[in-house]
Amino acid sequence: MFCRKYAFQTWKQFSRFYSAVNNIRASKTRNIGIIAHIDAGKTTTTERMIYYSGKIKRIGNVDEGDTVTDYLPSERERGITIQSAAITLPWNQHKINIIDTPGHADFTFEVIRSLRVLDGAVTILDAVAGVEAQTEKVWKQASSLNLPKIVYVNKMDRPGAGFSRTVQEVIQKLETRVVLCNLPYFETNKESDLEFKGVIDVIHQKLLKWNEMDANGNEISVVDIDKTTPELLQILEKSRESMVETLGEYDERIIDSFLEHDENYLKIPPILLDQVIRKATIDNYLTPVFCGASFRNIGVQPLMDGITKYLPSPLETSLPEITKNGKEVPKKADDEKGLVVANDNNLTLALAFKVMTHSTRGPMTFVRVYSGKLNAASNLINTRTGKKLLIRKLLVMHGDSPEEVKSISAGNIGVIPGYETDFQTGDTLVSSAVAKRNFTAKDSAYRLLPIDIPPPLFNAAIEPHTAGDEAYMKQCVETLIREDPSLKVHLDEEMGQVVLSGMGELHLDIVRERLVNDMKAKVNLKDVVVSYKESYVGKKEKEAVITDEEIEVVVTLSHTEDARDYIGQEGALVIEGDNNVILLSQTALSEHVQATIDERRWKCENNLEELKEAILNGCLTALQMGGPILGFPLHSTLVTVKRWNAPVEQAQEQALNLMNASRQAVQSLKNEEKDFSILEPIMSIKVYVDSNDLGEVSHDLTQRCKAMIVEIQDQSTQNLETAAWAKDEATKVYVPPDYTIKKNVSKFDDIANKKIIVAETPLREMIGYLSKLRALTQGRATFDMTLIGMRRAVGNRVDSIVEEYKF
C-alpha cells in the first residue's frame, strides 16, 4: 500500500505568501461566512483554518477562551460568538475573507448584515445534533440572498455522531440536493469501539488519515483506494455512482465522460467533477458536503480546499443592486478590475456593513468594496450625509489584530479606522482611483441596497449611580448603538430612565455586561421586559388644529392595518418597524404659502423641503413619545397632515416652529385612553422535543405560557410528507451506514422519536423559557421562535401588563 504525506505548505511559506495576499485578483478571492447553530463548532473550525493558513503559530481553544475570532471578554467567558469577526487569510494561491457569525438567535441581525456582504457560506452542522432550528433559520436567510453554500458535518468523533443521518436531514429540512465530497473513515480501537480517523476523498479516490501523534493535524497520510482495500472501494464506488448521477442531471458533460470511459464511474476525471460541482454550487443547484472533527484537527484542510474550489468569487455572484437617484445603474463584472459601475473604471463604491468601537483602537468601520479600489490617504463621500472625508488608513483584520494596507480592491473586505460619528451601518461610500477627483451632488446620489433592521422585542432600563455618572453612561450607550443598529434607546420621561431595546434576553444581557465590565460605566441594571406598543383603535378619525400666531398645523389620527400599503406614495413617511405612517397630504399646503411660492416672495431661511421634513419629524417624535395608557410607542397608526401654514414671506427660521406645532397637534390627539389599546408581540415557536417529553412540555406551554398549540409534527418526516421532491431526492443519494449510531443505540435516541410542537404565544411568557424547558427535559429539548406580529391584549393580559408597568 502506497502512503505519502499530504503536501501542505509550512507556516513560513504562508507568511511570505501573505505579504502579497492583498494583491490577489478578484477571481481568486472568496468572501465567505461561517454560519450554523450555537455550539456546532464555528469558532473552533475558523481557528483551525487560520492556523493552517499560517496566520497563527498556535491553535486557540474556545474552552480556554483564547481564540482569535472570539475576542470580546463576554464571548470568551460564554464560549459563543457574539460579534462577527472579519479575518483575511491565504490558501492555495487564493484569498479567503472570513466572517465568523453568531449562532445564537438573539444575534440574528449580526448574521443578516454579515450575509449581505458575502458571496458564499459554509454551514457547519453538529453530527450528533443534526440540522438544528437556528441552522434552518440562517440557511433560509442565506438562500433568500442566493448565496451558494457548502456543508461541513463537524464533531464526527463524538459518540452518537451520524453522518448519513445528518446528510438525510440536510436534504429533507434544508431542501437541497447534495454531493458527498468526502465520507467519514473509522477504525476499531482496543475497546472495540469505532474511532473517527480521517475521510474518504470521493473525487480523488483517496483515503486521508490524520496522524494521531501530530497534535496540530498537519501530517496527513494519503492512501490510494483500490482493490487492496475492498471495503473502502465498495463504499467509494457507490458514492461515485450517486455523485455522477446527480451531476449528470445538471451537466451533460458528465454523461458524455461516463460513456467515454466505458460507463465506469471511477474513471471520470476529478478535474471535470470539480468543474461541474463548482458550476452547480454557484447556480444553487446543489450543496457539496464535507465532514470532519475540527477540535481534533481532522478534515479542516479538505474543507478549505472546497471553499476555494466550489464557492464563487465576487465576479461570479449576483451583482449588487445599485441605484442613482432611485434608478438602476448599469454595471458589469471584469476579471481584472472587478465590478465596474456606470462604465467608470475609477468609480469606487463601498458599503459600511458594520461599525464597532475597539477598547484601544477606537472606532472601526468594516466595509465591503464593490467596485474600484479604496485607497489610503484618499477622499471619499458618505452619500447618507453628503460629507467628504479624508481616509488616512486602511486595515484588514486578523481577528482582533489589524494589518495596515495601502488599498482595498473590489470584492474585498477591510476596515476604516477612526471617524467616531461619521459612519453608520448601511452607509454607501463613494471614492475614486483618481486622487484629485472633485465630488459632486451626482456622486452623493449612489445607493447600495440598505440593510434592513428588524424591530427589537425586549426592553431593559438603565440608570446612572449618580447624576455625575449620567454623561458617561449616555456616551457609552451612543457608542453601543453605533456598533449595533438593532439596539434602540429611548428616554422614559415619567420614570427618568434610559430604556434599551434589543432582539432578545441574551442580547441585552451582553449589552449590560459591556456597559459595566468593558466600558466601566457606573449604572444600575433593571430586569429585561417585553417591548409593548399602544395603538389607536377609535372608530372615527380624530382631528386636531394647532395655531400659534401665523403658524398652523391640522392633523388627523386613525388606525392602519399595514403601513407597507403606503410605500411609494408621495408625501408618505413609512416607519415599517412600528407599522406607522405619517402622510403629508398633497393639498396640505395653505393658500398663503402657495401664493408666496407662486409670487416668488419666499424669504424664509428654510426651503420648502426643510419645512416639510420638520413637520414629519414633529409627528414622528409624538408617535415615539407613546400612548396615554402606559406610554408605550404607538404602532399601526396613521397620522395625516391635512393643512399647514407659516409666514414664509418673512426672513426668519420656521422649521422649529412647525416641528413643535405638529408634535403638539399629534400629542393632543392622545388624551383619551378609551381610544387606545395595548399591543403585545406574539411569537410563533417551534419546540424540538423527544416523544417521552411531549406531554409535559405541551402542558407547560398551554398552561404556564398561555400558548395555543397549532400542530405537532414528526421531526423525521415533517418535510418528507409535504415535499415529494425531498422524499425522492433522499432516496437517490447514497450514504454509508451510520455504524457509530448502531454501536450506541442504547445510549442515543433515534431521530424518529423527535417531535416538533408548533405554537403561538405572547412573548412575555417566553422570558426565561429555555432554562425552564431544559429543566423539564433534562436538557434534551430546544426551541426557536419568530415574531408573528403585534396583537391586541385583552382581559387578564391587559391587567398583567398594567400591573407590570405601573408602580
From Swiss-Prot:
NCBIfam families: small_GTP. Keywords: GTP-binding, Mitochondrion, Nucleotide-binding, Protein biosynthesis, Transit peptide. GO terms for cellular component: mitochondrion. Mitochondrial GTPase that mediates the disassembly of ribosomes from messenger RNA at the termination of mitochondrial protein biosynthesis. Not involved in the GTP-dependent ribosomal translocation step during translation elongation. Coiled coil: none annotated. Residues 27-315 form the tr-type G domain. Belongs to the TRAFAC class translation factor GTPase superfamily. Classic translation factor GTPase family. EF-G/EF-2 subfamily. GO terms for biological process: mitochondrial translation; ribosome disassembly. PANTHER family: RIBOSOME-RELEASING FACTOR 2, MITOCHONDRIAL, TRANSLATION ELONGATION FACTOR G-RELATED. SUPFAM superfamilies: EF-G C-terminal domain-like, P-loop containing nucleoside triphosphate hydrolases, Translation proteins. The lineage of its organism: Eukaryota, Fungi, Dikarya, Ascomycota, Saccharomycotina. PROSITE patterns: G_TR_1, G_TR_2. The keyword Cell membrane does not apply. It is found in: Mitochondrion. This is Ribosome-releasing factor 2, mitochondrial. Residues 1-18 form a transit peptide. The keyword Ligase does not apply. SMART domains: EFG_C. The gene is MEF2. One of its GO terms (molecular function) is GTP binding. It holds the Pfam family GTP_EFTU.
